[in-house]
Amino acid sequence: MICSGEFGGLHFFNAGNLVSRGEFIHQRRVMKCWVLIYMLSGSLDISSGGICRSVASGEWLFLKPGEEHFGTAPSEGELSYLWAHFSPETPFFEGESGAAYTLPEYGRASSQRIGVIFRQLVDCSRRNMYTTRMVECALEMLLTELTQEHLDSCGRCPLHRRTLLCSRCVWYGSLSVNLPLAAGYQPI
């Protein structure tokens, strides 16, 4: 699991959309930054950190800085994926809980939101009218959405989110003595 102790603090470098009509094989390289790939169509066969994967439509993959990655087989048919290069101010770490960003290295999007936000990031990065901060905010939103999808899929809900949900129940519904317990409050 890729983790960060704090939100924000991301340096965005560039992003784009690779499209190939067939026989694409990812070149062998080592990047000094993080790479995030999100597949729109087709399948990308790639090795990174000694692990071979076939990344299909609707799936994402993080490639770590300093690790060699390369294609392991040519693509069949059309291939299209979005990619972004970035670095955090505070290095990501391997961990599991208590982190602002909690990102599996590889996963499947459970909604269309990931693709929509990623396209916004690519679009913002291509327009000169946007500030650097706006592009970094789009990247933050993408990583936050990936984190939220992961937490939702694991059935884990951070304490502040549980508290917010309980507050909504109080605001829109009836008050119950069980609400503080649902938010994780433990009486003395």
Predicted features and spans:
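Amphipathic alpha-helical segments enriched in hydrophobic/aromatic residues interleaved with Lys/Arg
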Residues: 95-160, 166-173
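Basic/polar phosphate-binding segments, predominantly the helix-turn-helix DNA-binding elements
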Residues: 172-188
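Generic structural signal for secondary-structure transition and capping sites
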Residues: 20, 44, 126, 151, ...
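N-terminal regulatory/effector-sensing and dimerization cores
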Residues: 11-100
